[in-house]
Amino acid sequence: MQKKRVFSGIQPTGQIHLGNYLGAIKHWVELQDEYENLFCIVNSHAITLPIEPIFLKSQTYELVKLLLACGISPKQSGLFIQSEVDEHPALAWLLDCQVSMGEMQRMTQFKDKSLKNPKSVNVGLFNYPILMASDILLYQSDLVPVGEDQKQHLELTRNVAEKFNRDFGNCFKVPEPLIAKVGARVMGLDDPKVKMSKSHKGANHAIFLLDEPDVIVKKIKKAATDSMGVIAFDETREGVFNLLNIYMLLSDESPEKIEERFRNKGYGDFKKELAEVVIQSLKPIQERYQEISDDEVKAVLNCGAEKARPLARATYQKAKELMGLI
């Protein structure tokens, strides 16, 4: 029986943090045994906001190293860079011509990013969801792991695929969302009301996968809690709940077992143990990261691109012919 194909993309716009790992990458690693996976470094998406070319290039390779260190296996999955497959922007143009302005103007993420960077709003940022649709549809993807903030974009992708198939003939699979039950939203340590982010300015906001042990201890020690002093899984107590969620996801212990473990302990003891759990969980990733050479990264990317290009080419040629393009 043929495995279903999963497509996932990640931007090379900064250091990978614990939220990226628990919310997406750890899930991707677990998917490898069950599905055929394509993991794409979506560097073309990264230029929709200002970014230094040298930084973008170095971060692209650093991200590949970290994904490999986390457990993405080139023997099980295709790992490649978006800009090395020319059909991504080519198909995006075909899809651009099928989507109304009204549908695009309803995209909430464009509005949010425009407010944060009003001087840097460009057409690429507006068209971001169409390029994302192209990324997914090129590979006849069955499933797409998405967080809450990407659900609207996947819905647009589904609508675009259905409309194209209806207007021109069957071309695209209509992908389904694959949503992790837990871990999809890890919040900031210093502000548990916002999702952990690479771009947040707070020095103690995020734990990065390459943070030294003493840095991790310091960040967790300063993490927001409350004045109640009771360690329990209560979503209304955002700070404590966020830290407990991290502990649960890394330790694989049940909420009941964790609450029992810390029943008569204070936040100081809990944070100390949480820091140790985080440090021990990241240790093998950090060790593997140091072992990966630049040559290994390039070999993995070449192999991934060779796997991706024929799939993308076949879909693009079919879409092009159905639209009457020579």
From Swiss-Prot:
Organism: Helicobacter pylori (strain J99 / ATCC 700824) (Campylobacter pylori J99)
Listed GO biological process terms: tryptophanyl-tRNA aminoacylation
Keywords of this entry: Aminoacyl-tRNA synthetase, ATP-binding, Cytoplasm, Ligase, Nucleotide-binding, Protein biosynthesis
Family: Belongs to the class-I aminoacyl-tRNA synthetase family.
Protein task: Catalyzes the attachment of tryptophan to tRNA(Trp).
Span(s) of short sequence motif 'HIGH' region: 12-20
UniProt motif ('KMSKS' region) ranges: 195-199
Stated name of the protein: Tryptophan--tRNA ligase
